[in-house]
A protein has these predicted regions:
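Flexible, acidic/histidine-containing loops and adjacent segments that form or flank the divalent-metal
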Residues: 1-6, 82-191
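Conserved beta-strand hairpin/beta-sheet module of binuclear metal-dependent hydrolase folds
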Residues: 2-67
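Active-site metal-binding loops of divalent metal-dependent hydrolases
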Residues: 13, 38-42, 77, 161, ...
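Conserved acidic residues
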Residues: 34, 70, 95
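A generic structural signal for short
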Residues: 46, 73-74, 132-133
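Metallo-beta-lactamase
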Residues: 69-80
């Protein structure tokens, strides 16, 4: 077995996830395959104070000098995984977005309105309720899928695979997805 010379970086985005995978690949732009898995939160409150070293995924990629993203993965629709991907996609225009739902589901989704739960008196304190975080994530998911397709990328449904699948000359992935019945119920609930 040959040694892998890529790099995996777990970006400190707080409670969510944001993982950057880089591997040399002469067939990719700049001879580098770049994959972004989840993007952390889009909420300002997650990064306020910055005494914990938390950083927005887009800001981290900018500081690192990342020039492109070949593959973006949204593992599931939660605010602290999905919402941070939107500014990344706006800046780096991924070639593909892998996500767990049917590829056209986002086209059927209606925009969701937020509640006033972050408001005390007449002043909004920027604190989202759990329900509003999920609404935000659903709205951002739809925007993300639209942006990727409008920029020529593909929205792809991840499905369980019997073996490791190559995504570049140096990177293979094994997709572990939810039970088919669970996924179908989630899709029905969101439609």
């Amino acid at each position: 077995m040959r040694a892998w010379i890529g790099q995996v970086t777990f970006i400190n985005v707080g409670y969510g996830e944001a993982i950057l995978v880089e591997a040399p690949d002469p067939s990719c732009r700049d001879d580098m395959f770049v994959m972004m898995i989840d993007g952390g939160s889009g909420e300002d409150a997650e990064y306020d104070g910055n005494d914990t070293g938390r950083i927005r995924a887009a800001e981290y990629l900018e500081k690192r000098g990342i020039r492109h993203i070949d593959l973006m993965v949204n593992t599931h629709i939660h605010e602290d995984h999905t919402s941070g991907l939107l500014p990344v996609a706006e800046r780096w225009r991924p070639g593909a977005l892998w996500q767990p739902f049917p590829t056209d589901m986002w086209t059927e989704m209606k925009p969701l309105r937020m509640t006033d739960e972050g408001t005390i008196g007449h002043q909004n304190h920027g604190i989202l309720s759990t329900a509003d975080k999920f609404r935000t994530a659903l709205n951002d998911y739809k925007k993300l899928c639209r942006l990727v397709t409008e920029c020529g990328g593909q929205v792809v449904q991840m499905k369980p695979q019997p073996a490791w699948q190559p995504v570049s000359s140096q990177v293979r992935v094994n997709i572990l997805a939810p039970d088919r019945a669970v996924l179908e119920q989630q899709v029905d609930d969101m439609r």
